[in-house]
Amino acid sequence: FLRPLGLRLKEVSSNFGNMDGVNATFTDNQILYNYPIESVFYVYNILTGENKLIESYSAYTQNTVKPLATAVNDYSKWERHGLENPHFYEVMYIPKYKMYMRLHLKETEFDKNKSVAELSDNRELYLTCWNESFQFLCEVMLPGHRYNYYTGWCGLYDGLLLYVNNTTSKDELNDLLKIDVVRPITK
């Protein structure tokens, strides 16, 4: 039997280019969801129906995306808009440590003399971590010119797997599958 959930989904307009979708992660009793356009995220408890806003702000990047002045169907404007604003990815649950992790990209200045791929792969990538109660633990910048920013990661039972494949790193461009796994330091 199906029942509607009390998710408070936003209507995100096309004024945000290709950042108008919702990211969702499912755990045993929760649905975590967020939007690429803002640093905050939401937690819906499947058992109680409670919907909670988690206010989490980056110390290193903008925390909200500025909309395009008008809705446009020009993909090159969407690409530029995407580069000049941060991009917040899904919140992932790491069961072994009962913690949550999220990646996000810092905004960058558009340079018409560089390709979109070069500008994209030169962006700074940040990892933010929270404990099981969604209390902030840390925010760190990951090594530059190392990772694939287009779904080049996944949450694991005991960490975050990142694919080592960035077009700006000549050392990492080959046919071998290379990965890094980020795990918390425990005592």
Language model: regions and residue ranges:
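Structural signature of eukaryotic scaffold interfaces centered on beta-propeller domains
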Residues: 14-27, 83-96, 153-157
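Surface-exposed loop and turn segments in beta-propeller and other repeat-based domains
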Residues: 1-18, 52-83, 140-148
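Loop/turn-rich, solvent-exposed surfaces of beta-rich toroidal or solenoidal domains
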Residues: 82-132
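Hydrophobic beta-strand positions that form the internal "hydrophobic ladder"
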Residues: 30-32, 100-102, 160-162
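Loop-centered beta-sheet repeat module
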Residues: 1-45
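C-terminal structured domain segments
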Residues: 117, 125-168
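Beta-propeller blade signature
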Residues: 38-49, 116-135, 174-187
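Short glycine/acidic-enriched loop and turn motifs that connect beta-strands
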Residues: 38-40, 107-111, 167-171
